[in-house]
Design a protein with these regions (language model features):
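Positively charged n-region of N-terminal signal peptides that target proteins for export
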Residues: 1-7
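Preference for extracellular/luminal or secreted protein segments
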Residues: 2, 20-89, 325-430
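Second-shell loop/turn segments in exported
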Residues: 39-43, 72-77, 94-103, 151-164, ...
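Second-shell residues forming the walls of enzyme active-site clefts
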Residues: 61, 103-123, 127, 209-374
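Hydrophobic faces of well-ordered beta-strands that scaffold small-molecule active sites
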Residues: 67-74, 92-97, 127-133, 181-185, ...
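Glycine-rich, aromatic-flanked loop segments that form ligand/cofactor-binding clefts
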Residues: 116-146, 166-188, 210-234
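Active-site-proximal loop/short-helix segments
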Residues: 141-146, 180-200, 231-247, 279-282
Length: 430
């Protein structure tokens, strides 16, 4: 087993070394590329997953496509009828679950199962069932699950094999609960102790440490079929402002961005990444509009897609945060601006009225031409491909008794004991 992890770590180190040279950050919008000429033989050579994704896309209504652009949360006392409305009317891409939504493993399992069953009756694509499970400060697993410490402690231990095992173990327990997407890890580089939001949640203060441990955690998660969504692109570390309450403005130039903030994201993309969370942070030296990255075509398209070569899904940080909604006069303006800039999915974790506004804005934008059909299909196709690639279904991976044996299992505790012996880092099971 240790030999396997040694091989994994060698591969990760090589990937990170290669990724430390980040392509030049774009100076601005690049001219459009002329459309490729059609090739009748290309259809025969098309990848089967791509062909299936395009077939599913062709059969979807505009309402179904708009719904795929939303991941939503809901209050703990939400009735089944309201959950059904998310699925039947809004046709959402997925849900984000918080501790308010369940009291223990049994209720979490039952909720995930119910959402999947409802969705399977009416929608063409399975749900993302998501959570924030970083370990430590940000941990949503119910009592009885295996809890790892904050990323800062894991990074200080200096054992990427430990980090891989942490990601893998978390993924096993998430999968047992019916969760298939995790908004983790944090890839922000934090050396400023005044950054109270992220100082414990970051693996360290250098691109090398954050890259090594971030890619290790991602590989561990994805080895068990859970989609990792690292955050907060393009980097929330160099500030003491919190985007929950304001729009952080970071005075970073091109050279610093290229040699520092972007390095962990480039390493993760090169190692294999299907989704990334985009933060509500502004970099006026790089994008003079002053818009947050989650609304900036410079970051969403020029840097993320063209410079870093990312082909997966871009998901916003929660758009109910002040760092986002304060950037335009209305929610509708924010949404249209973000989507046309290149964002794929809007995360809206709390308020039904805002979720309805976002869905209506997207639908109206598609119908009145502010959002082109080509742009809509581009994002929805990415989402379909990610769901197909990761084998998402609306059935639970395990029956309840088997799932309960996995969650907080003796095997996982034994892994923690092994890690404690190897590193001297105390990992707790709660």
């Amino acid at each position: 087993m240790k030999r396997l992890f040694s091989i994994v770590i060698v591969v990760l180190i090589l990937l990170i070394a290669a990724s430390c040279t980040v392509p030049d950050v774009s100076e601005g919008n690049t001219p459009p590329v002329p459309p490729a000429q059609s090739d009748p033989e290309a259809e025969d050579r098309k990848d089967p997953l791509e062909a299936k994704a395009e077939s599913l896309l062709a059969g979807m209504t505009i309402e179904e496509k708009a719904g795929q652009l939303l991941i939503v949360g809901f209050p703990g006392d939400t009735k089944k009828e309201a959950l059904q409305d998310y699925i039947d009317r809004l046709k959402v891409s997925g849900f984000i679950l918080f501790s308010r939504n369940y009291t223990d493993f049994d209720s979490l399992y039952a909720l995930a199962r119910s959402l999947k069953e409802m969705n399977s009756l009416n929608n063409p694509l399975p749900l993302f069932i998501s959570i924030d499970e970083e370990g430590g400060t940000v941990s949503r697993l119910p009592k009885g699950g295996t809890r790892f410490p904050d990323a800062r402690k894991v990074g200080k231990a200096g054992e990427p094999g430990l980090t891989y095992k942490a990601g893998q173990t978390i993924a096993k327990e998430l999968k047992a609960a019916g969760i298939n997407l995790n908004f983790a890890p944090v890839l922000d580089i934090v050396e400023n102790g005044e950054n109270k939001l992220l100082i414990k949640r970051s693996y360290g203060s250098t691109p090398e440490v954050v890259s090594l441990h971030g890619t290790s955690f991602i590989s561990g998660l994805q080895s068990e079929g859970v989609t990792a969504v690292p955050k907060h692109f393009p980097g929330h570390g160099n500030t003491n402002q919190d985007s929950h309450s304001t729009l952080p403005v970071i005075d970073t130039d091109k050279a610093a961005m290229q040699s520092r903030e972007l390095v962990p994201f480039k390493a993760a993309i090169d190692a294999g990444l299907d989704a990334v969370m985009v933060g509500h942070i502004a970099f006026p030296k790089l994008d003079p509009t002053g818009l947050p990255a989650s609304m900036s075509s410079y970051f969403l398209t020029d840097v993320l897609r063209k410079d870093l070569g990312f082909g997966g899904i871009s998901i916003s940080d929660d758009i109910e945060m002040q760092g986002y909604i304060s950037s335009k006069d209305t929610v509708e303006e924010c949404v249209i601006s973000s989507f046309n800039a290149g964002l794929d999915i809007f995360l809206i974790g709390h308020t039904k009225a805002i979720q309805d506004q976002v869905y209506k804005a997207l639908l109206d934008g598609c119908r009145d031409g502010r959002i082109s059909e080509e742009r809509l299909n581009e994002s929805v196709l990415r989402i379909i491909k990610a769901k197909l690639k990761n084998g998402l279904t609306d059935t639970m991976e395990y029956e309840i008794e088997e799932a309960k044996r996995i969650f907080g299992s003796d095997e996982h505790k034994a892994i923690l004991e092994e890690l404690n012996g190897d590193t001297g880092t105390f990992l707790l099971s709660r």
